[in-house]
């Protein structure tokens, strides 16, 4: 199977289901940003040994979100994976576990101090952009709202992970004011 089809050479692509849309379509922008986020998570997976299982689960969930967003219709006849409360709860559990190892947050933290911590912040901002892109679709079914909730919680996870990396490396957080 060839990787190239030449079907996108005129600025169009297909949704899951076959409908052709412009590559500037909001849905393409949304799942493209989720794909970008997944690549950033992959880099964290490669660089940070302490959260490999969680980061791998996050990557699989982001791939599922991409499939959901790329479906042709809001109520697709195609069997798609679901984002559930369990996916969101996994992130919340990890946030709580990491948070117990950290001092209380009293000031705004600047994204700096260690390259991996800073990369968590870069990834967090990509996550927030992905969330905004999904919200811009203004899709109401629960499956889309769960995607928004997951992305929102994932940005929190990445923030707390950035703090934990600093603590593990005995680096003081740089704060604003």
Predicted regions: what is each one?
Residues 1-177:
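Phosphate/pyrophosphate-binding loop motifs in nucleotide- or prenyl diphosphate-using proteins
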